[in-house]
Design a protein with these regions (language model features):
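Core catalytic lobe of class I
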Residues: 1-234
Length: 234
């Protein structure tokens, strides 16, 4: 397993050498890793984020083995009146997927990771999740925001198939194959550091360890190189 801060680490890897990649990309404005200008989280807006992110996708296209997978963990992003001019949601997962598709990656899989809306309400005080909104103006009410693990496949003929034996029984496969993972512990993550910008909490994208375990278990062979471009922390 290898990790770095986006592209500099990837530039040292040989072509077609990585068996699998899994990470949580920086969410513009809301999440940050460091003060470095090379940190993708340190951007002014979504357009600047994707301009930077494009270089990473190009590197992933180069270093991934043909027929192998890249998984990214993400969520729809809340839009605020102060920052965006309206209250609503932004389709960040769709924007990420389309960015990968522009580089030739193939949309392969998507799983929804359930998150407790009560916990989200207590943490964010989002207008759409407050019970008082049901009474005062329920047109503004919405559901909680889940996480997603979206997987894309590098095109080309696979030279080494990923195979499993008795260690991957049918009951485990049925659990992993579910389109909704209900049993992911949201606090089982690698944490880096916290920071604050105005009154909004800026923290790293919390990719749960069990999500990493399932991706690696399903989509890798022993001794594969697994790349996490953001130090495994996202």
């Amino acid at each position: 397993t290898t990790g770095g801060t986006a592209t500099p680490e990837g530039e040292g890897l040989p072509d077609a050498s990585v068996g699998y990649s899994i990470f949580s990309p920086p969410f513009a404005s809301l999440y940050t890793y460091s003060n470095s200008p090379r940190d993708m989280g340190n951007v002014r807006d979504d357009a600047e984020l994707f301009e930077h992110f494009d270089f990473l996708i190009a590197e992933l296209r180069r270093v991934m083995k043909p027929g192998r997978n890249v998984s990214f963990h993400c969520m729809d992003m809340p839009a605020s009146k102060e920052r965006d001019g309206y209250i609503g949601l932004k389709d960040f997962p769709g924007d990420l997927l389309r960015a990968f598709q522009r580089h030739g990656f193939i949309f392969h899989a998507k799983v929804t990771i359930w998150k407790d809306p009560v916990t989200a309400m207590q943490r964010t005080k989002a207008l759409g999740l407050l019970h008082k909104s049901v009474r005062e103006n329920s047109a503004m009410c919405r559901m909680g925001i889940p996480d997603y693990l979206i997987t894309v496949r590098n095109p080309g003929e696979q030279e080494d198939r990923v195979t499993h034996g008795a260690e991957f029984p049918v009951d485990l496969w049925q659990k992993v194959a579910s389109p909704v993972w209900m049993d992911i512990n949201p606090s089982d993550t690698l944490q880096f550091r916290s920071a604050r910008e105005h009154d909004d909490e800026r923290h790293i994208c919390p990719l749960q360890l069990d999500v990493i375990r399932r991706g690696v278990m399903l989509w890798t062979n022993p001794n594969d190189i697994v790349l996490s471009p953001f130090m495994g922390i996202g």
